[in-house]
């Protein structure tokens, strides 16, 4: 009976934002404050189908791709059950997406994980959180590669790339610094 209605998909973004392969990672890397799931009909072009409902959650400062995926999975499981009967009974309306507002969440490349200390501290933390656990954000120091698992904003000010204290605190491009919590 659902086949007659078309195929349904639950996409891990608030469409039309972040169509594509890596919506969770891209939303975190781009410092979004909210994300969610969209229940949509499948169309030939990727993630362009009409949407019947979208459900939002906040992205907290300590969230990463893993925690957001868990939250969105639970939200999707709950909300699809609320929508199936309405879809079958034609009690729910699917609305076309505004394609002019679409953004694309390209597949993540491992090379995107390399930290550029001239970026803002917030962007670097977004990259660390967005790429956790895989493929991961990393930096090269004295020829060695270090994968960064967790970091937070710190209060030190220094030159770009300068280590500022007895724990690892690195100054970034916007004269703010990050505290590396876990490598």
Where are these regions (language model features)?
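Acyl-group handling in specialized metabolite and lipid biosynthesis
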Residues: 106-119
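Basic side chains
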Residues: 19, 107-110, 127, 145
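Short secondary-structure boundary/capping segments
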Residues: 29, 43, 105-107, 138, ...
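Donor/substrate-binding cores of folate-linked one-carbon enzymes
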Residues: 1-104
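A generic structural signal for well-ordered coil/turn residues at beta-strand boundaries
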Residues: 33-36, 47-48, 53, 109-111, ...
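An anion-binding loop in the catalytic cleft
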Residues: 118-183
């Amino acid at each position: 009976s659902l086949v007659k209605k078309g195929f349904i998909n639950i996409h891990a973004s608030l469409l039309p934002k972040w169509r594509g392969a890596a919506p969770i990672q891209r939303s975190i890397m781009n410092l979004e404050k909210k994300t969610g799931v969209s229940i949509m009909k499948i169309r030939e072009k990727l993630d362009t189908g009409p949407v019947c409902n979208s459900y939002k959650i906040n992205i907290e400062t300590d969230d990463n791709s893993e925690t957001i995926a868990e939250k969105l999975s639970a939200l999707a499981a709950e909300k699809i059950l609320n929508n199936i009967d309405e879809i079958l009974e034609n009690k729910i309306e699917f609305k076309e997406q505004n394609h002019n507002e679409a953004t694309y969440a390209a597949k993540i490349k491992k090379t995107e994980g390399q930290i550029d200390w001239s970026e803002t501290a917030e962007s670097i933390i977004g990259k660390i959180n967005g790429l956790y656990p895989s493929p991961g954000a990393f930096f090269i120091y004295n020829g060695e590669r270090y994968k960064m698992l967790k970091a937070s904003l710190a209060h030190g000010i220094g030159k770009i790339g300068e280590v500022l204290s007895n724990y690892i605190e690195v100054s970034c491009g916007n004269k703010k610094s990050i505290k590396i919590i876990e490598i």
